Amino acid sequence: MLKTIIFDFDGTIGNTQQIILRSMQATIKEMGLPERTDCQCAAMIGLPLTQCFTNLYPDYSETIVDEEKGALCAATYRRLFDEFNEPGTVPLFPHVPETIKALHQKGIELTIASSRSHQTLDAYVRDLQLGEYIQYILGVEDVKDAKPGPGPVLKTLKEFRRLPEECIVVGDTKYDIQMAHNAGVKAVGVTYGNGSRKEMEEENTEWIIDDFAEMIDVCNSFL
């Protein structure tokens, strides 16, 4: 029986793509790095920030961003993101509020594991009025083996004393699916975020949904 759901936030619950891309492009410009397209930047969403920039400028690129410079990019990104992040900038995806409420009423433990900071997750959960339903939050600084590693899932399982077969991960990118599978947990991929159906299929995702409301059907399949 399903006991616990671990949700990604960006691209799964909150529609943050535009502010993320704006912040990444502004960071690239401020740091004097070669241009990258929005598509290239979007492909990094879901990774820890430093890794986003080291992956955008790898060893074979015209400009290399190592770990040290990647950390500087990450700090610049956070500052710019905070500047751009005005109230109402990040909406929930369709059917998230009522579906989250319905899942909570079923007695399922609802949690979030994200590559963004714990502080910003707390703020979004509060501002988007999800605090009544979300029982546990993990940001990138809360775990050692961050997404796509299994760290966030394993820590959540330990917190709630659950087995892998009692939990699912819900996310919009291959990194979410890899995190789930690396921890021995099944995954739900959403197609409306930053990833694609093809990406989910390539990761052998157990369920692929086009609308958050379909989470009710996924959960019912466990009963």
Question: Language-model segments: which ranges?
Answer:
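Asp-based, Mg2+/Mn2+-dependent phosphohydrolase catalytic module
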Residues: 1-5, 101-104, 117-118, 123-223
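N-terminal helical cap/lid subdomain that shapes the substrate entry/recognition surface
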Residues: 2-97, 104-106
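Conserved phosphate-coupling serine/threonine residues in phosphotransfer and NTP-handling enzymes
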Residues: 12, 114-116
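Residue-level marker of regulatory loop/turn positions in helix-turn-helix DNA-binding domains and
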Residues: 92, 113, 145
